[in-house]
Amino acid sequence: MSMERKELLDLYSDYLVASFGSTTATGLSQLMDGEVSHDQVTRFLSGTKKTAADLWCHVKPLVRQIQSDAAVLIIDDSIEEKPYTDENEIVCWHYDHAKNQQVKGINFLSALYYSQEVSLPVGFELIAKTEIYVDSKTGKQKRRSPITKNEYCKELIRQAIHNQLPFRFALFDVWFSSSDNMKFIKQQQKRDFVCPLKTNRKVALSRQDKGQGRYQRLDTLELETNVVREIYLEGVEFPLLLAKEIFTNEDGSTGIIYLVCSDTSISFDEITTNYRKRWQVECYHKSLKQNASLAKSPTQTVTTQTNHFFAALCGYIKLEQLEGTSK
């Protein structure tokens, strides 16, 4: 990246953080009294498409200042809705688990490193649905990604470890709690995780039960709260600690979450306290969308949309730096 492009990234990410309305090349040029032209901004956004490797180069010095063995690595995805933007391989229809429906927008997957009360993105993927197929039920053309989000999840974790990031646990929600992901983290990468399970997952209460195929659904177990129990999950060879936590929702109702941890030496409080750190990724998503102008760009191509997303990440990192220095 030339000095001009570094300066433009710095300027453009400042612009995203400072803006309240739409962010455009013309708007930035006018704000700078023409010192930066519309064409310069357009060329910057249309340049080489930014990747997770570029993000790591950008954030690495900051991560090294806060990294610790007690950190957590959080994997999660979100959708930036773009209902009025022309469809392409990244602006397309995705299933939104929160809304339980299909929405049009950019589906992004992040690896967020949380250490010493600072949250920094250290990897990302924009889900690109590059394959066109015909839905057998409706006869309509649809898009799909040749790479699953679970595969991207593993790649983000693998890359974080390759980048020598120390962390105590990988954290993720129920959508990434596959047996395959668990085995990848514990057996291949030699790391530990905490994650929730769907209530229909099958578990055995001893190695002997597992060997004899005696499994039962999670929601049929009689489990006390505030204690842990060693279990064997169907499809996973190694034991896990199971913790049942009862929580109160905003509307006053109660819910139950079943958490499993691959480190069988820790307590109930350690499991639940660490998993609560996953909330940081929700704060990150909210800040990225509301404070870094993620949705306020009229960019139309995959490259300009990707580079705008990258600049929004850089804007978020600046805000996190400012918040960190004010603590």
PLM features per residue range, with description:
Residues 9, 22-25, 38, 52, ...:
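Alpha-helix initiation and N-capping motif
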Residues 12-15, 45, 49-123, 128:
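Active-site-proximal, Lys/Arg-enriched surface segment
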Residues 23, 36-40, 50, 54-58, ...:
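Generic alpha-helix structural propensity
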Residues 32, 48, 62, 275-278, ...:
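Alpha-helix boundary/capping residues
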Residues 36-37, 119, 283, 296:
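Secondary-structure boundary/capping signal
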